[in-house]
């Protein structure tokens, strides 16, 4: 496998939180190599989650321990270890992501970019889930294969 990344998934973020304030909040735990808020490609607005990557495992573990459930910009955040990029889809076990928070459709639809698999994972096109690629609760989108009510964008519910 490629180099190990010590990456935290950070969920429940306020819309106002940006890459810099995310990094600032976590920098007390060790050297950060990357911090990124995931934005909606169409609106440019934060999707309410992001990733912080540390230089070493101890810093990552300390950050998870120290920040999970804490308040950042007025919201209680969730912090846990991110799925590794090579693991496929954390929630969906599908090629190219699937499931989880934002990956492969997940909660809130189609995405490109982001982390890997599970939480916000790498994907282009379809996917399903709530609001996902082929429709579901989020309406008609191009590509993809359904989820709840998916396929052609319709839901029979």
Swiss-Prot record:
Keywords: RNA-binding. Signal peptide: none annotated. Induction: In response to stress by wounding. Residues 6-84 form the RRM domain. Residues 86-138, 145-157 have a biased composition (Gly residues). Residues 70-157 are annotated as: Disordered. PROSITE patterns: RRM. CDD domains: RRM2_NsCP33_like (cd21608). InterPro entries: Nucleotide-bd_a/b_plait_sf, RBD_domain_sf, RRM2_NsCP33-like, RRM_dom, SLIRP/GR-RBP-like. One of its GO terms (molecular function) is RNA binding. May play a role in the biosynthesis and processing of heterogeneous nuclear RNA and in the maturation of specific mRNAs in response to wounding. PANTHER family: HETEROGENEOUS NUCLEAR RIBONUCLEOPROTEIN 87F-RELATED (PTHR48027). This is Glycine-rich RNA-binding protein. It comes from Daucus carota (Wild carrot).
């Amino acid at each position: 496998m490629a180099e190990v990344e010590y990456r935290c998934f950070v969920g429940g973020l306020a819309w106002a939180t940006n890459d810099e304030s995310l990094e600032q909040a976590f920098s007390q735990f060790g050297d950060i190599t990357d911090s990124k808020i995931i934005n909606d490609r169409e609106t440019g607005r934060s999707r309410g989650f992001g990733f912080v990557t540390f230089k070493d495992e101890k810093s990552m573990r300390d950050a998870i321990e120290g920040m999970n459930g804490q308040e950042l910009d007025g919201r209680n955040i969730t912090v846990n270890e991110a799925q590794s990029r090579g693991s496929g889809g954390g929630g969906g076990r599908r090629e190219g992501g699937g499931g989880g928070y934002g990956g492969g459709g997940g909660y809130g639809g189609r995405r490109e970019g982001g982390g890997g698999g599970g939480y916000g994972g790498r994907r282009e096109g379809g996917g399903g889930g709530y609001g996902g690629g082929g429709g579901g609760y989020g309406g008609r989108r191009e590509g993809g294969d359904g989820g709840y009510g998916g396929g052609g964008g319709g839901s029979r519910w």
